[in-house]
From Swiss-Prot:
It comes from Listeria monocytogenes serovar 1/2a (strain ATCC BAA-679 / EGD-e). One of its GO terms (biological process) is coenzyme A biosynthetic process. Catalyzes the phosphorylation of the 3'-hydroxyl group of dephosphocoenzyme A to form coenzyme A. Its EC number is 2.7.1.24. It catalyses: 3'-dephospho-CoA + ATP = ADP + CoA + H(+). This is Dephospho-CoA kinase.
Length: 200
């Protein structure tokens, strides 16, 4: 059995950049956000359960999930948010574990799980080690304001809805400092990968 590495960070710390670097290095990566979309595609049991609970009006004309509408509903209603998580989370977990199993059967020795809310969702047990992509909170705030065109207050509200990046870094087995150049970030990514995969 190979090793599973959890990749996480906070909003605008650069996790997507590191995720791309890992894939460019030829290492398999299973993305929780993609899994979350797959398990509610038309024809899935996940979507059927969502429609049964939220009603047909949660669908777009083409039968796909109206994510914007659903997002507004669950943002305001804790009970409905918990119900959605109850429907989707076990399916996302199953999707990711099945994908990992396929990679291991194909002879891969290292698989990354890209999970934005790894700590918040208490999914540490799915992985052998955890990488946190870190920047200073000041850099995180600046990047988020620029990237999403947000006010300082809006950006802080998003950042504060998650566990702080410094706290996540303390829980990590390995921290990638993404506060400087992309070259320095890439060097850290490759250094980590080389610890596990000698022939890549």
């Amino acid at each position: 059995m190979g090793k599973t590495i959890g990749l996480t960070g906070s909003v605008a710390t650069g996790k997507s950049t590191v995720s791309s670097m890992i894939q460019q290095a030829g290492i398999p990566l299973v993305d929780a956000d993609i899994a979350a979309r797959k398990v509610v595609e038309p024809g899935t049991e996940g979507l059927k359960e969502i429609v049964a609970y939220f009603g047909e009006e949660i669908l777009l004309a083409d039968g796909t999930l109206n994510r914007a509408k659903l997002g507004k509903i669950i943002f305001k209603d804790k009970e409905k948010r918990e119900k959605l998580n109850e429907i989707t989370h076990p399916r996302v977990k199953e999707y990711m574990l099945e994908a990992r199993e396929r990679f291991f059967r194909a002879g891969e020795e290292l698989v990354f799980f890209d999970i934005p809310l790894l700590f918040e969702s208490h999914l540490e047990s799915l992985v052998d080690q955890i990488i946190v992509v870190w920047t200073t909170p000041e850099t995180e705030l600046k990047r988020l304001m620029e990237r999403n065109n947000l006010t300082k207050e809006e950006a802080l509200a998003r950042i504060n809805s998650q566990i702080g990046i410094d706290e996540k870094a303390k829980k990590a087995d390995f921290v990638i400092n993404n506060n400087e150049s992309l070259e320095k970030t890439q060097k850290q990514v490759y250094t980590f990968i080389e610890r596990f995969v000698k022939n890549k």
